[in-house]
Amino acid sequence: MTIALTGGGTGGHLAIVRCLLESAIKKNIECVYIGSQNGQDKAWFENEVRFKEKFFLSSKGVVNQSKFDKISSLLHTLKLSKDCREIFKKYHIQAVFSVGGYSAAPASFAALFSHLPLFIHEQNSKSGSLNMLLKPFATKFFSAFEKEISPYPVADKFFDNARIRKELKNIIFLGGSQGAQFINELALNLAPKLQEQNIKIIHQCGKNDFEKCKKHYQSLNIQADIFDFSLNLEEKMKNADLAISRAGASTLFELCANTLPTIFIPYPYAAKNHQYFNAKFLQDQALCQIFMQNSINLDEFFKSILKLNLENISTRLQNITQKNGADMLIQKALFDNLTFIR
């Protein structure tokens, strides 16, 4: 069997693609990847040899575009979907699995036009525009946030490095794969207070702010573990006892898998405020704290860091997600629904 995996744009979407690829390989399913020249798709998968083939199309997002540009983008997407249909024919694609993001649009529409099963994984608590549009036509729609809960695909390495946290010795600041200026500034402002408490700092700051953050820590004579980006983030997480993080869905569930207590600062400009609702999923279970970016008081924030019951939260995070989530999605989509697959 050969399937197409499509979608991306950001690290969160692409992490799911990688999990699905690894699970498909276990079942001897070959995968063709269809992504975009824009975003992070090529950086993640251009050299990924486990795909049967990879295609990076000229797809682009429509968020914040004018009405005319949105129409133009839609017409371009329809043109690219025709190219995808040719890819489906050439590689005998039997089903399409979308993880969302604008780079999923051409192949997803092509699946509908070609009468192929379309499976969609929605990573966020608030569905993106493309997934909302396609959901009624999908063969199966998966979400970790809906009533019929599906496991969120998280790489095994985050579970393998999990441990119960009991004492705050190390704190990690996570701004996402591209860094977050606000979280970087927060980390630098908190650094002297953390040093007074003998709390060590691990800081993912992104490429743009790396030199600035490095020099600031040096000026404070603080030995922070600072890095711009890491493909082995689980190695950094396992050394931390608390995380300060944005609330992208993949990051959130990776933190859960690692049983790492977290204070979330949702990105305030995320579409439909989905990062806040992602974090609220945990807050409603008393499993995290949320601070809104525009109302943070440094002293109050620091007090919250020291007050968290790390052991209680870390222990209960074990029940939020489960290992082999991607395996379950592949099983549900392609084997429990064999009548859909020609």
UniProtKB/Swiss-Prot annotation:
GO terms of biological process kind: carbohydrate metabolic process; cell division; cell wall organization; lipid glycosylation; peptidoglycan biosynthetic process; regulation of cell shape
Annotated residues for binding of UDP-N-acetyl-alpha-D-glucosamine: T10, G11, G12, N124, S177, Q275
Sample GO molecular function, one term: undecaprenyldiphospho-muramoylpentapeptide beta-N-acetylglucosaminyltransferase activity
Membrane topology category: Peripheral membrane protein
Record carries keyword Phosphoprotein: no
SUPFAM superfamilies named among the record's database cross-references: UDP-Glycosyltransferase/glycogen phosphorylase
Cellular component GO terms, alphabetical: plasma membrane
Primary residence: membrane
The keyword Chaperone is annotated on this UniProt entry: no
Membrane spanning stretches: none
Gene3D superfamilies the UniProt entry points to: Glycogen Phosphorylase B
Record's subcellular location: Cell inner membrane
Described function: Cell wall formation. Catalyzes the transfer of a GlcNAc subunit on undecaprenyl-pyrophosphoryl-MurNAc-pentapeptide (lipid intermediate I) to form undecaprenyl-pyrophosphoryl-MurNAc-(pentapeptide)GlcNAc (lipid intermediate II).
NCBIfam families named among the record's database cross-references: murG
Protein family membership: Belongs to the glycosyltransferase 28 family. MurG subfamily.
Identification of the protein by name: UDP-N-acetylglucosamine--N-acetylmuramyl-(pentapeptide) pyrophosphoryl-undecaprenol N-acetylglucosamine transferase
Gene this chain is encoded by: murG
